[in-house]
Every structure is written in structure tokens, then in C-alpha cells.
């Protein structure tokens, strides 16, 4: 399980510089399972994120803190670039549709594009044959931005309806149209979410026997979030002024990571690592959009197996469970009928700058969230070493958390892919330093669902109030979302 990294005395300056660079460049990851990175460093990524049972370099301690004692003193720095392209095609509302809560202008929208840096760093000190300690920092997240288009709100109701700039109506009324009730957001028209999570961890590993080690890590987490283009939904939030377009907001918190690494037989090893839910402070600027105000980082459980079928060859298989469903803003699903009956219609009929709180509105206890569920990710990797060069390949699947029926969530953040194919190689230099390279491709994934809010039937609620019946039917407009990503990572491991 060990890669020997020649040891020298620790050097504090490179560590500090790497940490500063990491914090300066931290941006969301793209080839991800939900918002979780599939692996840390080019060696793990070349295996599609498998490696809970392997201590290949210091990045192993970011997944499994028990790995540190199997490594010599050393450091690793990784820098990747991502080229994501996310698109959503929106169809027209059916010809027989007379009313709708919100429908998006038909067309093709590019929601994610660009080149993004993805840095990480890890450090390990081997104190003795039985103990090791170190630290590391990494980032992940979610980013989406959709420009152009318009949205119709309360379509078909004379005096109520409005058509606004922006795919969710966050901008001003379209030229030549009226907005008597002020439903348009009159703010940023582009629709987007930008969430970055940075984890700083310090680990301690202890070898119980020659073949068994355990580890623990304290984890500090910082988050940065921005929401744009949701101004039309401010009227349907419990805190309208804290719904959208308020710049970046920050939160922080922490938790614990535990790990075990066991060589159960010659050529066979197993590993397991658990990270607790990382509790976070509230995003005060976006309490009107985020259920409960805070966005905790979901707990994860990783279990891995590695087998050495022949000298220099390894086969790895990992399982990863991510409990997104336990985090209320992620796990809360959009209930279209309840949102219509208990939020949209009451707020539409009774306009107020200081509305009373309604549980079904944005930010409420029963308000809409991302509609994500728990995921189980399967990772398979193969590694072959020939002299100073090591080749890797991997494939992972099963990491899409978005539940069926969460159409608007997919439009807001379609950057979800659950299949990753990877290739990697390493070159050990004469100095003992190692260069790792990984190419990650998130295979294009397409989802097709209907916008149940785009077609509605007028009805009467209890008390003879106006109401809508919203459910999926052929008159609803269709949303087809797709995402594809290429990432290139280069890691450098050395003995400071």
C-alpha cells in the first residue's frame, strides 16, 4: 500500500504558499458526483476516484486519514482545468394550454461554459513507524449561469400576467408588455448559482499492527454562495429581500473524518472512510431561498478494495454513499401542487412588502429545495506499473442525485453527470519526485422532463379562492438538459 517518498526536513514556506494559492483559485468542480469531487489528485482521478484502500501519495489522506502512516513524509500539489458545457432545450407549451404559473421562452440555453482552475494540496509527515500526521485543502462545488430568454408569469390571467426578461423572470418586463402587479424581478436577468466549498483538514494516523492502521481528521469547511436571476420568486419567498442578487455570501463550519486501512492478506487490502455531516452557519443574504438558511455539507461513506493480481498491477473497486437527502436544502423536493395552493396563489392575490410567513414558500420549512436524494457511486480502477511509468484507467457510475420531477432544479443547475471515464499516468523522476496526469471525461447525460408549472387548470380552493391544478400532462413544455465535461489534472509529489 506504500509509495516511498524520500524524506527531508519539513519546509513551511511551500505549504503556506500552496494554501494561499488554493484559497485564491478555489472554484467549483465539474466532473462531480452531485457537488462532491470523485477523487483527490491526479492519481485517484485516473482511477475514476477509486483508492480508499490505497496509499499512493499524500492525497490519499484526504479521502482516508488512515493512509498517512503507510506513506513517507511528502507533499502533493494538483492543478486541474475543466471545460464544462451544459445545455437545456425548452419546448413550447401545448396549443390547448390557457393558463400557467411560469413557463420559459422556448429555445436552447447554454447554462455552463468556460475554463475553470481546480487546485488542491496535501502534506504528510511520517513521525515514526506507527504514527503520521498532516493536512490538506481541496475544493468542490456547483456553478451554472444561463443568459437570455424570458419567462411568462401567471399566464392567462388578465391583469395578473407578465412576461419578464431572464429564463426565470428575474429581469425587467419585456418591451411593450405590462407588469401591473410587479411580478418581474427587475434585477439580474441571467439565472445562476455559484457554490464553492473549501475543506481544510488535519489528519493523524496510527498503525495498530503491521497490517492495520486507523486515522482521524478534523475538518474545517468554508462556503461561498451566490444566487442570481430569481427576482420573480422574491414575491413567493418568506424573506423577499434575501432571495437573490445579493452578491457572494459566506458560511463556515466543520466536522470529523475517520478512516481505517487493512491489508487483510498478501496482495489484498481494504479501506473505509467516513466523513460526518459538516454543519455550517447560515447564508444570511439568501435565507429567503435556502430552506433553513444553512447549507450543510452532506456526510459521506467510502469503502474500498484493492487486489494485486500480479507484480506491479492493481485492481481497485470503491463504493461511495453521499447523504444529500439528509441536508434539508438539498433533500427538500418541489411539491408543485402544494407550492401553488399554499404559496403562489395566496401571494399572487395578497401583495405585500412584508408578507406573513408561509411554510410552502421559498425559505419555509416545507419550501422548495434542490430535490436531491442520496446517491451510491461505484468506482472501478486498474493500475499497471512498468519501471518508472504507471498507467491508470477507471470508470465510475451512479452519482446523479436529482430526483425525477424536479424540472426547475435541473434548469437552475443541470451540471450533473453520473458516469465518468478516466485515463492517467505517472512518471517517477530520478530525484524521487512523481508527476501524475489524469484525463477525466464526464460522459454526456441527457434528461427529459416536463415543466408542470407551465400548464395549469383553474380550480377553486377551500373558501372559494382561485386556484390552479398543476400536474404533468401533454400540454406542459418539455425540458431536455444535457451536460458534458472534460477535465485535465496534473499533480506533483515531492519530499520537501
Which role does the model predict for each range below?
Residues 1-13:
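N-terminal secretory signal peptides that target proteins for export/translocation
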Residues 30-40, 44-45, 115-496:
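Outer-membrane beta-barrel porins/channels
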Residues 28-73, 266-267:
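Outer-membrane beta-barrel biogenesis signature
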Residues 14-26:
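Bacterial N-terminal signal peptides
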Residues 55-63, 69-161, 197-198:
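Outer-membrane beta-barrel translocator/receptor signature
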Amino acid at each position: 500500500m506504500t509509495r516511498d517518498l524520500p524524506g527531508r526536513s519539513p519546509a513551511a514556506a511551500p505549504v503556506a504558499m500552496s494554501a494561499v494559492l488554493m484559497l485564491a483559485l478555489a472554484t467549483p468542480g465539474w466532473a462531480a458526483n452531485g457537488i462532491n469531487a470523485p477523487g483527490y489528485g491526479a492519481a485517484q482521478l485516473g482511477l475514476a476516484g477509486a483508492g480508499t484502500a490505497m496509499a499512493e501519495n499524500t492525497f490519499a489522506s484526504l479521502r482516508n486519514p488512515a493512509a498517512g502512516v503507510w506513506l513517507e513524509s511528502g507533499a502533493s500539489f494538483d492543478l486541474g482545468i475543466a471545460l464544462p458545457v451544459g445545455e437545456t432545450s425548452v419546448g413550447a407549451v401545448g396549443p390547448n394550454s390557457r393558463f400557467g404559473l411560469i413557463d420559459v421562452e422556448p429555445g436552447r440555453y447554454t447554462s455552463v461554459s468556460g475554463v475553470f482552475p481546480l487546485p488542491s494540496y496535501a502534506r504528510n509527515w511520517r513521525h515514526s513507524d506507527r504514527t503520521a500526521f498532516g493536512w490538506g485543502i481541496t475544493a468542490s462545488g456547483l456553478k451554472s449561469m444561463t443568459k437570455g430568454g424570458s419567462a411568462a408569469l401567471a399566464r392567462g390571467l388578465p391583469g395578473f400576467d407578465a412576461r419578464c426578461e431572464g429564463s426565470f423572470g428575474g429581469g425587467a418586463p419585456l418591451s411593450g408588455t405590462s407588469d401591473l402587479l410587479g411580478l418581474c424581478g427587475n434585477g439580474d436577468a441571467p439565472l445562476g448559482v455559484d457554490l464553492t466549498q473549501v475543506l481544510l483538514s488535519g489528519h493523524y494516523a496510527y498503525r495498530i499492527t503491521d497490517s492495520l492502521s486507523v486515522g482521524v481528521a478534523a475538518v474545517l469547511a468554508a462556503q461561498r454562495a451566490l444566487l442570481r436571476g430569481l427576482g420573480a420568486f422574491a414575491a413567493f419567498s418568506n424573506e423577499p429581500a434575501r432571495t437573490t442578487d445579493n452578491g457572494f455570501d459566506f458560511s463556515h463550519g466543520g466536522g470529523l473524518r475517520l478512516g481505517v486501512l487493512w491489508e487483510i492478506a498478501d496482495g489484498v487490502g481494504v479501506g473505509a472512510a467516513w466523513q460526518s455531516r459538516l454543519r455550517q452557519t447560515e447564508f444570511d443574504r439568501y435565507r429567503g431561498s435556502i430552506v433553513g438558511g444553512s447549507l450543510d455539507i452532506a456526510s459521506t461513506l467510502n469503502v474500498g478494495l484493492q487486489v494485486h493480481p500480479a507484480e506491479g498491477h492493481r485492481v481497485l473497486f470503491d463504493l461511495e454513499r453521499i447523504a444529500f437527502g439528509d441536508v434539508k436544502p438539498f433533500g427538500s423536493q418541489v411539491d408543485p401542487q402544494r407550492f401553488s395552493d399554499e404559496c403562489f396563489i395566496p401571494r399572487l392575490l395578497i401583495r405585500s412588502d412584508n408578507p406573513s410567513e408561509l411554510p410552502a414558500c421559498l425559505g419555509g420549512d416545507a419550501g422548495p429545495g434542490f430535490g436531491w436524494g442520496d446517491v451510491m457511486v461505484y468506482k472501478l480502477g486498474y493500475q499497471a506499473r512498468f519501471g518508472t511509468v504507471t498507467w491508470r484507467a477507471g470508470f465510475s457510475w451512479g452519482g446523479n442525485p436529482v430526483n425525477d420531477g424536479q424540472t426547475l432544479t435541473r434548469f437552475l443547475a443541470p451540471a450533473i453527470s453520473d458516469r465518468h471515464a478516466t485515463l492517467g499516468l505517472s512518471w517517477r523522476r530520478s530525484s524521487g519526485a512523481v508527476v501524475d496526469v489524469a484525463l477525466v471525461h464526464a460522459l454526456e447525460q441527457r434528461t427529459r422532463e416536463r415543466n408542470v408549472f407551465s400548464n395549469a387548470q383553474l380550480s377553486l380552493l377551500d373558501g372559494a379562492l382561485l386556484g390552479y391544478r398543476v400536474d404533468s400532462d401533454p400540454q406542459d413544455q418539455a425540458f431536455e438538459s444535457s451536460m458534458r465535461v472534460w477535465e485535465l489534472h496534473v499533480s506533483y509529489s515531492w519530499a520537501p
